[in-house]
Amino acid sequence: MPRASECLSVEDTLRVLDGRTIHAFHIEGCGGGHVPNVLKMAGVPNVIGSSTNPTLPFGRDAVAEHYGMIVSAHDLKVDLPGDAAMARDRIRAGTMGAEDVLHDLGVIGITSSDAQGMGRAGETVRRTFAMAGKMKAELGPLDGEGSYGTEASGDDNERVLRYMAKLTINPAIAHGFAHEVGSIEVGKLADIVLWWPQYFGAKPQLVLKAGFPAYGVTGDPNASTDRCEPLVLGPQFGAHGATAADISVAFVAEAAVRNGDQMPTRRRRVAVRGTRGIGPGNMLRNARTGTVDVHPGTGLVSLDGEPLVSAPTDSVSLSRLYFL
C-alpha cells in the first residue's frame, strides 16, 4: 500500500484487489499505508488485517514518540514542509486508540512487528498481552461467546485465547503453514514456549523447537543445582551446530517443491497452501467483519456506526518492573 496515499486511496486499493485475498500488514492507527484512513480496510471480507506494535497498547507518550519515529524510519527532512506535514498527518490519537478496540473486538486478527522501521520485534508478545490488559480495564471481561460480559464471567480465558491466536495460529493460517505450526496438535512441529505463570508474556522459561530445547533459562554452570543464580536466558542444545537446521523447515511455494530439491539448505522443505480464498472469517477467535469508517476531519473511528474510543493509558501490564 502507498505509505501516504500518494498513489491510491483505500477505495482504489480495494477496487484493485477486486475481492482477492490479501494480508494487509499495516492495518493500524499510525503506521504505514493509506493516510488517514487505512483502518477502513479492517473488517473487509477479503482483507486479513494485522498491525505492528509501536502503538500497542495506546499509551500517553505514543503521539509524541511517533513524530520522531516516522521521520527517522522514512528518512524524512523536517525542514521540508511536505515531509513535515506527511509525518504529522500519520499521527492521530483517535485511530491509535481505535486500533486497540478493533483488536479486542476481533476485527484485527494478527499482531506483528517491523524491525528498525516502526516496530519492536522483541516485544510483540509482551505488547499484545499488555493491550489485552488495557482493554479489560477499559471494557470489562469477555464472556464465553467472546462478547463483553461482567465480572461474574469469572475468568479471562476468552480474552487470553483471542489474543494468543493473534500471535500463533492466525499468522500461520494467513501465510499458509498452519498445517505445520501455529497450534499444539498431533502432526505439527512441537514449537512450544513454556512460561512460569508470573512471567507469562515477559520472560519465557524454555523455548522448544521441534521438541528440542533451543533457548531458555540456564543457571551458573559451576552451581550444584540448576536454580542457582545468576539465571540467564540464552541458546541451548537446539541452537548450536547443525541442529538448528535439522529441526527447522523452509517454507516454499508448491511450485518450488515440484521443481525439485534445488535450495542450498539441509532444512526440510514444506509447501505453503491454502492462502487463496481465505479472509478474516478464517481467523480463529478474531473473525468479526464490519464497516470501519474514519472521519477525515476528527479522526474518529466507528465500526458499523458505533464510535470506537480508547484513552491513552498511563500504565501498562508487563512493563519495566519485569526487567529490572
Tell what function each PLM region has:
Residues 2-164, 199-200:
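Active-site neighborhoods of metal-dependent hydrolases
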